[in-house]
Amino acid sequence: MKNATSLIIYCFLMFLLMNNVKGQGKKKPPCPLGLSANGKCGHDGPKLCFSEMERKFNKDVVKTITHCKCWDDRRNNVDKHRCTCYLKHGFPCTNG
C-alpha cells in the first residue's frame, strides 16, 4: 500500500512538472518601435520617449510598451535623440 501511494504521488508530481514545462513554449521577442526628434534625451530619456510615443501612436499601441531607450545624436550641428520602445506584440510586428 505504501508503494502504491508513493507511485501515485510520484506520477502526480511528474504530471505537474511536465505540464509546467510544456506551457513555457518559445517566448516571442519584444517588437521594437523607433522614432527621432529634436533635442537631447536629458536626465530621464526613457520617459521622454514614452511621452513621444503617446503623442504619435494610439492608446492600443502605447498600452503594449514594455520599456523605452533613448540615445543622443548630433547631426549637422543639431541635437537630436533617437527613441526605441519595445512592444509586447502587435503593430508594427505581425507575430501575433
Curated annotation (Swiss-Prot):
Q: Which UniProt keywords apply?
A: Antimicrobial, Disulfide bond, Fungicide, Plant defense, Secreted, Signal
Entry's Gene Ontology BP terms = defense response to fungus; killing of cells of another organism; signal transduction
InterPro entries named in the record = SCRL (IPR010682)
Can you tell me where the transmembrane regions are? none
Record's GO cellular component terms = extracellular region
What Pfam families does this protein map onto? SCRL
What domain of life is recorded for the organism? Answer: Eukaryota
Subcellular location(s) of the protein: Secreted
- Residues in the signal sequence: 1-23
Q: Which cysteines are joined by disulfide bonds?
A: C31-C93, C41-C70, C49-C83, C68-C85
Please state which protein family the record places this protein in: Belongs to the DEFL family.
Protein's UniProt name: Putative defensin-like protein 236
In its UniProt entry, the species of origin is given as: Arabidopsis thaliana (Mouse-ear cress)
Taxonomic path: Eukaryota, Viridiplantae, Streptophyta, Embryophyta, Tracheophyta
Its gene?
Answer: SCRL20
